[in-house]
Swiss-Prot record:
Involved in pre-mRNA splicing. One of its GO terms (cellular component) is Prp19 complex. Residues 106-116 have a biased composition (Low complexity). Residues 124-142 have a biased composition (Acidic residues). This is Pre-mRNA-splicing factor cwc26. Its main location: cytoplasm. The lineage of its organism: Eukaryota, Fungi, Dikarya, Ascomycota, Pezizomycotina. It comes from Aspergillus fumigatus (strain ATCC MYA-4609 / CBS 101355 / FGSC A1100 / Af293). GO terms for biological process: mRNA splicing, via spliceosome. Residues 14-189, 211-242 are annotated as: Disordered. Belongs to the CWC26 family. Associated with the spliceosome.
Length: 344
């Protein structure tokens, strides 16, 4: 039904009708297609639109105009399937380019295979520094990929899961066996100082032993320096007696001349009759071989006689005299105590 007859029908039946407008309708603008197949390179703007340009485009849009979708790639760009690269100095034919690309790909694959084989051969030859090439297809894995946790990727059956668990157990046992077979010195603790340098424990222990030995030697030397010549001679004589006692009989009788001479040489202040039986030798030389003083002298704790050059003057502080007086007083008190106990 034509528009005019429709308006008349509505006016006749319902008494309302929109008047026919003489305004021409807008037609959709058609974009001109540009053949880009013959052109070389197509440059597309990959930068995302910013807020300012988006707002400007939104204000300039016509509500009644056609909607343009900018995210869709052009048909010409999708239609361009062939490469527009040209070889300088040679014929730009499609068959030659395809052959060249195929040859280049074959050369790359051949070089990669040769490099992999050479690396694998070096690894079998015993080069520890060469990178190890590990195949993803393991005997226990069945050639399947595994996730980082060690489980197979994808769905598995109960048999596959049991086989995977058994393989993991075998790996753990093999690793534990390697750790047990490893020597103990390889597991020695590494000590480091504050700066991070490794400390040689054996060297430090040797230095500590050396320092301890030097300290002991210094102490012995200091103790030796405090001793006089007489003490050293007496110590040497005592050592000599111990050496001779090894060959000495256990029972020493009256026929032992050495023992008799030693007992006769002893002087006792409370045995005046001993002077009639034995002849005492006068002061001759000391233990060190030097002559002794022949006159009277103040007694001392060690019984050492003064040298022959002594002038008879006692230059001490009187300690020896007080020491003998204290010992005599203590002896008298003990004797009196014993007598008083007997009287009671």
């Amino acid at each position: 039904m034509p528009p005019s007859s429709l308006a008349e029908y509505l006016a006749k039946k319902y008494l309302t009708a929109d008047p026919a407008t003489d305004r021409p309708k807008k037609k959709r603008k058609k974009t001109k297609t540009v053949d880009t197949a013959g052109d070389g390179l197509i440059i597309a703007d990959d930068d995302p639109p910013d807020l300012r340009t988006s707002a400007t485009n939104f204000d300039n849009e016509d509500d009644e105009g056609p909607s343009l979708v900018t995210s869709v790639r052009s048909a010409e760009f999708r239609r361009a399937k062939k490469s527009n690269w040209r070889t300088v100095g040679g014929p730009a034919t499609g068959s030659s380019n395809a052959n060249d690309e195929r040859d280049a790909a074959d050369a790359i694959l051949a070089s990669a295979a040769a490099e992999s084989a050479a690396r694998r051969g070096e690894g079998e030859g015993g080069d520890d520094e060469a990178p190890a090439v590990v195949d993803e297809a393991d005997a226990d894995d069945g050639g399947e990929l595994r996730m980082e946790s060690g489980a197979r990727a994808g769905l598995q059956t109960a048999e596959q899961t049991a086989a995977m668990v058994a393989a993991q157990e075998r790996r753990k046992k093999a690793e534990a066996a390697r750790h047990r077979e490893r020597p103990a010195e390889a597991q020695e603790t590494i000590y480091r100082d504050a700066s991070g340098r490794i400390i040689n424990v054996a060297l430090k222990r040797a230095e500590a032993r050396r320092a301890e030995q030097e300290k002991r030697e210094k102490e012995e030397a200091a103790k030796e320096a405090l001793m006089g010549d007489v003490q050293r001679a007496e110590r040497e004589a005592r050592r000599q007696q111990i050496q001779e006692a090894r060959a000495m009989p256990l029972a020493r009788t009256i026929e032992d001349d050495a023992l008799n001479e030693e007992l006769k040489a002893q002087q006792r202040w409370n045995d005046p009759a001993a002077g009639f039986l034995t002849k005492t030798k006068g002061p001759g030389v000391s233990v060190t071989g030097k002559p002794l003083y022949k006159g009277a002298f103040q007694p001392n704790r060690y019984g050492i006689r003064p040298g022959h050059r002594w002038d008879g003057v006692d230059r001490g502080n009187g300690f020896e005299k007080e020491w003998f007086a204290a010992r005599n007083k203590k002896g008298r008190l003990e004797a009196l105590d014993y007598q008083w106990q007997m009287d009671e």
